[in-house]
Amino acid sequence: MAGRESPPPSAPSMAPISFGFTRTSVRRRLADLGDSERQAPEEKDFLATVEGRKLQSVNPPEAPKELVIPLIQNGSRRQPLSKNPKPSSETSTVLMSDGVLSQAVKELIEESKKSLEERENAGVDPTLTIPMIQKGCTPIEEGSDSEPQAETVPEEADYEAVPVEAYGLAMLRGMGWKPGKGIGNTFSQVVKPRVNSIRPKGLGLGANRMEAQDLASVGSHHPPRPDGDRENDKEGQPQGLMHGRAVVVLSGPYRGLYGKVEGLDPDNVRAMVRLAVGNRIVTVSEYCLRPVSQQEFDSHTSKPGHVSQTSTEQQNRATGTASSLKAAQNQEDSKRRQKGSEKKRKHSPDRQDGPVPKTEKAAPRNKHWLHRDLRVRFIDKLHKSGRYYNTKMTIEDVLSPDTCVCRTDEGRVLEDVREDMLETLIPKGEGHRVMVVLGPHAGKVGLLRSRDRAQSHALVQLRRENQVVELHYNAICQYMGPGDSDED
């Protein structure tokens, strides 16, 4: 054995080493959700009758069920009190076992003290966890790995079973609501909900629906015709409005005029109609139009006598609506101006209760009260669309006896202001300067001492004469300029 020679060590092989990985994919068979449905037997239904567009089945239809969504109760529950009292024998047994219970309580207290001392000596455990008991769930027991289970686990929501329009009633039924049952604890009563119907387009809150429906019957009434003619009229009578259709206006300023529809505005329920008389395009509400046949349109627009008499009057009425309205407005404005001139204070030196002689009536008024630096009130409602009506201003310059230039408190200058557009202004407080504008003391400046509103009189102390005079409100005006000594 010792003499046997050991074989020489083999030289390391230089062959390359390679590693390979293979992956085998196993096709897993997923559970087919439709297997259970396929296995269920299919119920065949047979057709019994066909009524119009409805198919009547052999099997009776299922009665609709009231959907109820139950209300989830609150998790904070209390233990109900026991209704059955304990018998007397049990009470005696409890009294006898009080000593045993007290001894057990003492032992528990001693054990808790020992465990507390051990924890204080050992320190705080960083991995200590206290499980949280969820609301409405039962706590888990020691040694069990299961999670706390809720006492009332909600079912999986089936959204297809409850339509959107029935969701609200289903919720109310789950809360205890029933149809016809009053709501409330003290004064329970059934309150019917108010359902607002959508108004037709083009009819606002002030419009009457019945009037809009009656417009169709306002048109021209034809004498009764035979049944054959009536049927022909119904067949030839167009229905609805469209571009190029002949119509007649039933109400409004263009009532009785014929035309053709040029365009429709469905948002505002209005139509653009080209009138046959005048060839004008007007905008009319669709409720005021009635479609007519082409024959009726030609018969009312091609007769020269008819056009010359009725249509011309209608055209004049339609075209003259704006002018008549303007004339009426001007007439009303003139009446208002006349009433305003009667109501405002008239600046006349002497007033007589008796009749005025004709010579005095015919005599022109040559006394004017305009003066510089007077504080006046603008009373014309028509000037600049009433922008300066009842505005206080100061006379800057007098261009003529009855024309002046005024300046407002904001600095705006009004030129060519007539005397009848202004009214004298009386200061409210005593001690303000006023100017006498009418009478023998016209042009003099004084101080206002007192006022008598009932008699429209005021006591004015004239500076130069140093006397107190009683004047009417129409004869004085608030003065904003220098004293009367500087005016001479």
UniProtKB/Swiss-Prot annotation:
Pfam families: G-patch_2 (PF12656), GPKOW_C (PF25088), KOW (PF00467). The lineage of its organism: Eukaryota, Metazoa, Chordata, Craniata, Vertebrata. It is found in: Nucleus. Its main location: nucleus. Residues 164-210 form the G-patch domain. InterPro entries: G_patch_dom, GPKOW_KOW1, GPKOW_KOW2, KOW, Rib_uL2_dom2, Spp2-like, Spp2/MOS2_G-patch, Translation_prot_SH3-like_sf. Residues 73-95, 307-331 have a biased composition (Polar residues). Component of the minor spliceosome, which splices U12-type introns. Interacts with PRKX, PRKACB and DHX16. PROSITE patterns: G_PATCH. Coiled coil: none annotated. Keywords: Acetylation, mRNA processing, mRNA splicing, Nucleus, Phosphoprotein, Repeat, RNA-binding. One of its GO terms (biological process) is mRNA splicing, via spliceosome. The modification N-acetylalanine is found at A2. GO terms for molecular function: RNA binding. Residues 1-11 have a biased composition (Pro residues). RNA-binding protein involved in pre-mRNA splicing. As a component of the minor spliceosome, involved in the splicing of U12-type introns in pre-mRNAs. Residues 1-20, 72-97, 216-241, 295-367 are annotated as: Disordered. This is G-patch domain and KOW motifs-containing protein. Residues 224-236, 332-341, 349-363 have a biased composition (Basic and acidic residues). GO terms for cellular component: nucleoplasm; nucleus; spliceosomal complex. Phosphorylation regulates its ability to bind RNA. Residues 231-258, 401-428 form the KOW domain. The modification Phosphoserine is found at S25, S115, S485. Belongs to the MOS2 family.
